[in-house]
Swiss-Prot record:
It comes from Salmonella typhimurium (strain LT2 / SGSC1412 / ATCC 700720). This is Universal stress protein F. SUPFAM superfamilies: Adenine nucleotide alpha hydrolases-like. Belongs to the universal stress protein A family. Homodimer. Coiled coil: none annotated.
């Protein structure tokens, strides 16, 4: 039985990506799993809900998605995985919501997600990894 693994990637944080590479490779090799990589572009309302400012002169969402997909595909090349077992996805919205939606849609057998050590912001707002652990219907491996 081939498993499906979802790997959310923050394309703006290469350190987090480095942390998950060996874990993803090891899990994928167990039974030739299909690995879906997902990056999420936070929507403007999501930024506003966090009280963050944003520029009124943002590029078009299609341009942002194309650039994000290009960056994600470059990151995927760092993983030692067969190209025919890998797929890249880009979504827009709340990262935790989109990760959970994709995990359910695939359906994923496992989510492998990198996380920072908690800080005050994490305690106030919660982390994406914590939300995924609480609400995912599949196994979740959090890598710190």
């Amino acid at each position: 039985m081939n498993r499906t693994i979802l790997v959310p990637i923050d394309i703006s944080d290469s350190e987090l990506t480095q942390r998950v590479i060996s874990h993803v490779e090891a899990e994928a090799k167990i039974d030739d799993a299909k690995v879906h990589f997902l990056t999420v572009i936070p929507s403007l309302p999501y930024y506003a809900s966090l009280g963050l400012a944003y520029s009124a002169e943002l590029p078009a969402m299609d341009d942002l998605k194309a650039e994000a997909k290009s960056q994600l595909e470059a990151i995927i090349k760092k993983f030692n995985l067969p190209a025919d077992r890998v797929q890249a996805h880009v979504a827009e919205g709340s990262p935790k919501d989109k990760i959970l939606e994709m995990a359910k849609k695939l359906p994923a057998d496992m989510v492998i997600i990198a996380s920072h050590r908690p800080d005050i912001t994490t305690y106030l707002l919660g982390s994406n990894a914590a939300a995924v652990v609480r609400h995912a219907e599949c196994s979740v491996l959090v890598v710190r």
